[in-house]
């Protein structure tokens, strides 16, 4: 029996409608999916990777990407407006914020220690006074058996070898934390090198891109010394020096000693803190921020709100496991309230 043309058309139309109805939930899901692209600091990258993995399990309609390119790169891309959020361990300055027409809210996410890592064959434990550490990176102390370093390490057979410093090749919030601490500790370093994300080093140093790059330089170079976020020191099995704090105690980096150092931090309304040489605990610590615009389209704003709220609540539960300090609960709630009030 042959179908009439009209019947055939009716059948095809019905089939097409049925197919459209069947796939419409998929199309709706695709239409509702939002991607948030971020870039910046390597200091919190291990933590942000974990954040993203856990966040997306609970929010499959939001895809978050984060490129660890360094704080300097994160700030530049934020100013250029080519990402949805940035990451930096150096709080943006007023002059940088003024370059962003959409405005910027700094959201603190974690704190942590910057470890001073070293590769000294035959030396399993190293102490460095604030003066010795600062003068090594300012170029004033050139050999490992310098009397000042020897005085920090009685009974240790220090090698008669040149000190090879390793620093960041890129603009870096980790470098900001490190140079801010050393400048607070020592006036010679402050005048010679100063505070910055990409200072002019005077030691002709080895250079590595990102925390992984500096860790790799130290790991493969005997008689070298560098600085990396504590998680990278642990991950790469690097030895960390005990650094003198204001109390005269030599302290190793750890979650406990970083928490002790950051426990007295007071967050102002703009959440920008520059902790130089804390009075207790491990003396080289800092915070890291998400750089959030104050204007988004409706879908991105809704996705950013979910992301920020999660990072400052459920996400904080992950900080301890990766040796990052948590943001105080009251400060986290203030940051959430600031997002709600200021982001349009």
Regions found by a protein language model. Name each.
Residues 1-10:
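N-terminal secretory signal peptides that target proteins for export/translocation
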Residues 3-4, 19, 26, 76:
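A general, composition-driven signal for non-globular sequence regions
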Residues 32-344:
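Flexible loop/hinge segments at secondary-structure junctions
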Residues 9-12, 273:
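Hydrophobic alpha-helical segments with strong N-terminal bias
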Residues 13-15, 19-31:
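C-terminal segment of classical bacterial N-terminal signal peptides
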């Amino acid at each position: 029996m042959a179908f009439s043309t009209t019947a055939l058309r009716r059948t095809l139309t019905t089939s097409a409608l049925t197919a459209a109805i069947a796939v419409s939930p998929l199309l709706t899901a695709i239409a509702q999916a939002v991607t948030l692209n971020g870039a910046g600091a390597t200091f919190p990258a291990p933590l942000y990777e974990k954040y993203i993995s856990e966040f997306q399990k609970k929010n499959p309609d939001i895809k978050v990407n984060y490129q660890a390119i360094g704080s300097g790169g994160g700030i530049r891309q934020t100013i250029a407006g080519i990402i949805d959020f940035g990451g930096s361990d150096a709080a943006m300055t007023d002059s940088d914020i003024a370059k962003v027409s959409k405005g910027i809210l700094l959201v603190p996410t974690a704190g942590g220690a910057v470890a001073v890592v070293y590769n000294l064959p035959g030396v399993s434990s190293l102490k460095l006074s604030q003066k010795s550490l600062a003068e090594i990176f300012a170029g004033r102390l050139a050999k490992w058996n310098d009397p000042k370093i020897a005085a920090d390490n009685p009974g240790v057979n220090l090698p008669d070898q040149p000190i090879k410093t390793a620093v960041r090749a890129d603009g870096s919030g980790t470098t900001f934390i490190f140079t801010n601490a050393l400048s607070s500790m020592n006036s010679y370093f402050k005048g010679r090198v100063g505070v910055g994300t990409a200072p002019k080093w005077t030691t002709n140093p080895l250079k590595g891109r990102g925390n992984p790059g500096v860790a790799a330089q130290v790991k493969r170079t005997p008689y070298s010394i560098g600085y990396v976020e504590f998680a990278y020191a642990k991950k790469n099995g690097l030895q960390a020096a005990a650094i003198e704090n204001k109390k005269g105690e030599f302290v190793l980096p750890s979650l406990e000693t970083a928490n002790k150092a950051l426990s007295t931090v007071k967050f102002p309304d703009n959440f920008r803190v520059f902790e130089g040489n804390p009075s207790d605990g491990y003396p080289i610590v800092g915070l890291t921020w998400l750089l959030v615009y104050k204007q988004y389209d409706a879908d991105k704003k809704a996705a950013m709100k979910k992301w920020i709220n999660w990072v400052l609540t459920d996400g904080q539960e992950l900080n301890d496991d990766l040796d990052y300090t948590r943001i105080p609960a009251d400060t986290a709630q203030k940051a959430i309230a600031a997002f709600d009030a200021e982001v349009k």
